[in-house]
Amino acid sequence: MFNRVPSRARGRAGRAAPFRSGRRPCLAALLAGVMVAAAAAGHAAATGLPDQLVTATVRADAPGRSDRAPALRRALGIVLAKLSGNPALEADARMAALDPTPLVLDLSYEDVLIDKPLRDEQGTYDRPFLLTVRFAEAGLRELLAALGERTWTGPRPRVAPMLALRHRDGREAALTADDPLVDRARAALTAAGARYAVPIALPLRGADAAPAGAVAVAGRLDWVESEFGWRAAFELGGQSWGVSGASLDEAFRALVGGAALRLRPGGGAAPR
């Protein structure tokens, strides 16, 4: 059941369909207006949501470089996806022209190479940084409403991936909480859970059922040499999805993001 990826799911998961300006000619202006109006209210109001839901960390160049706006847009996309439970918002084309700056409450940079000395000016500019951004809750709510989405503020169910992996060397393994041979996959899954604010509960070795109280997502990941990546297929409550030619990080984002989309109130994608 899990050795084939549905044809509609091939390629990168979570990609939004291109925005067609002819369908909603005023949407870009509407979103821009929402950003400005929401920022005024958002900066004045204390957030009632956990910081985890309104904060994202992305890679960026040195502080002050011209790439800050794209980095802020990436961070905003992650937060919108996390707050709504719709992973498609990460790559929503409608966000491409927006400036997220008015919604930023605070931000900070972390030098990834902090223990390595600076060698020259060029090296300084080329050093990678992690940019952590916290956005205003009121502004996020307004923006999600303009995008046809709602905030997912209630308790989130624990997700228990019940997965088999076939590695590049042909070795088969189950993804469990206590097998040291799947440390890399487990770390990628943990990162995906944090990205979408979905708690993860892995089974122990030998378990044939999900941990108590968790929602099981069945599936498998197979390394496919011709695609130079992982082909993954998942199933939850009779609904299936997947991804192909993916890294482990991308495959587990597809798993957790797809589960969030199906488990959020109302389930499924919001109407466009």
Describe each model-derived feature in a short phrase:
Residues 70-74, 78-85, 135, 144-156, ...:
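C-terminal/domain-edge helix-coil "capping" segments
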Residues 28-38:
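Bacterial N-terminal signal peptides
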Residues 1-22:
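N-terminal secretory signal peptides that target proteins for export/translocation
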Residues 53-99, 107-111:
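N-terminal Sec/ER secretory leader and immediately downstream segment
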Residues 92-163:
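Signal peptide-directed extracytoplasmic domains
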Residues 73-95, 155-211:
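N-terminal segment of the mature soluble domain
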